[in-house]
Amino acid sequence: MPYTVSPQTETDYWPEYFWLTKKYGDSEKLHELRKSLWGQKGNPSDFFAWFFTVESHLAEFDSSRRATETYKTFVKTVSLLTESQDPYTAKHQKKVAKLAQGIAKEMGLPADMIEGIRVAAMVHDMGKMSLPTEIVTKPGALTPLEISIIKEHPRRGCEILKEVDFPWPTPETVLQHHERLDGSGYPQGLKGDEIRLEARVLAVADVVEAISGRRAYRPGLGIETALKEIDKHKGVFYDTDVARACLRSLKGTKTLTADQWEFPK
């Protein structure tokens, strides 16, 4: 709410002038600014109401800017840590981020939502960093017990991400990226619109990269195989609109590389 004061004479505003002068260093400039905005006889309260409203907006902007720098630094740090522990996962996350961004653009989603999806994709598997490395990087098929452990990574990632002040629902998006429309996904078994749109986009991008790319236990199966999976199960596992946008955006693509789409600066 705007700052308001009750006195009706100029001298009654000296405490405010003193405060502003102490902060900005020139009472004459403040006085001239007030006159230029409201005239020689303008009510001083108008000036203070305006000034403190501006102050409030500047504070909000500064807070938003700090939050932006915080999440950018966090994402970069996570990427570096993941790369040092598991280069495959780090590369996978970058490719998924490119692909998810391309799908979201193809869908015509708002720019801010696209950026939120990209950021979530960059850290969507970070929960694996809290799991035993020998399981995450195992060069063979996983046992049922190991699979159950791996399935904890969305929840682990969400718990970590909740500690960061993201301007998007990043923790929830990461938590839900293995959910499926028919409720067969994990960890919550969500169905349909219970799954965030951001997570539905991320899910398709994740599956396409996982199938087409090399895994620790098998070679890559190629982009055509991945797209057949998406096409076959659209409307069942995967959101139909997201799946169609993916198929359109990758039409004619033979390989999926980390520079398929350009990262925003």
Regions from the PLM with identified roles:
Residues P2-F61, R65, E69-K72:
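N-terminal membrane insertion elements
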